[in-house]
Amino acid sequence: MTNEFLHFEKISRQTWQSLHRKTTPPLTEEELESIKSFNDQISLQDVTDIYLPLAHLIQIYKRTKEDLAFSKGIFLQRESKSQPFIIGVSGSVAVGKSTTSRLLQILLSRTVTDATVELVTTDGFLYPNQTLIEQGILNRKGFPESYDMEALLNFLDRIKNGQDVDIPVYSHEVYDIVPEKKQSVKAADFVIVEGINVFQNPQNDRLYITDFFDFSIYVDAGVDDIESWYLDRFLKMLSLAQNDPDSYYYRFTQMPIGEVESFAHQVWISINLTNLQNYIEPTRNRAEVILHKSKNHEIDEIYLKK
């Protein structure tokens, strides 16, 4: 962290966990295991120390938003409309965004009375592979230009205005948008939007994606650690694909392991690391909270915007 983060307060794990009264995590070890990402590590102690205080903080922000909306309604002399509380979650590939998002979905639905919580990943807003091929940018998949940012903005606008929306579905197994398949997203009490690009600006700079967020989280870690987690995940995906010819990873199961490791490392260097350094990490300071993970995946530091 540099002077770029002077407007953040650095909080140790020990201090953070003391900011919320100790309660029993509202999920079991088995549930936690079922929602964690393929190569991630998380414990019920992490839920107690990190995520329950975070869920409590989010509820504080939600109440503050509702109070402001009520006061604005009085000023405008009209009844304020209830809107979903939208949470953006960003960070590198393989850093654990999905685990954080799925866990928050459970915690908010179980700690806020009668709350409904929707979870959306921005992978569904990637252009289909055929479109990327036609545009000559298949090798730029994951970079800003490979996303239909206007569609993402339109989705956020409609959700913010209380409309239910159907969005495309992306499959990591086939490495493409699934034709004819849609995810129906309700305008719930909370809508969590997770993806590497959620803090980035569309090419139309007059509108910012972050303008739609009521709270935002960046999951951070050292570059060497993220690379190690990415390579580990890549190899584990191969083991799942051994008997699945439809999987994107099946082709790699037919290659010598040395070639596979070399290929995965090259993908990390040329795509994921470049994307992280040029487009993802520079948006880090747009988050309200930064969760920093150590080598063993444990969150050791929290940065809260002042």
From Swiss-Prot:
InterPro entries named among the record's database cross-references: P-loop_NTPase, PanK, PRK/URK
SUPFAM superfamilies: P-loop containing nucleoside triphosphate hydrolases
Protein's UniProt keywords contain ATP-binding: yes
GO molecular function: ATP binding; pantothenate kinase activity
Gene Ontology BP annotations: coenzyme A biosynthetic process
Gene3D superfamilies: P-loop containing nucleotide triphosphate hydrolases
Documented EC number(s): 2.7.1.33
GO CC annotations, alphabetized: cytoplasm
UniProt-annotated binding residues for ATP: 91-98
Name the UniProt record assigns to this protein: Pantothenate kinase
Species in which this protein is naturally found: Streptococcus pneumoniae serotype 19F (strain G54)
Source taxonomy: Bacteria, Bacillati, Bacillota, Bacilli, Lactobacillales
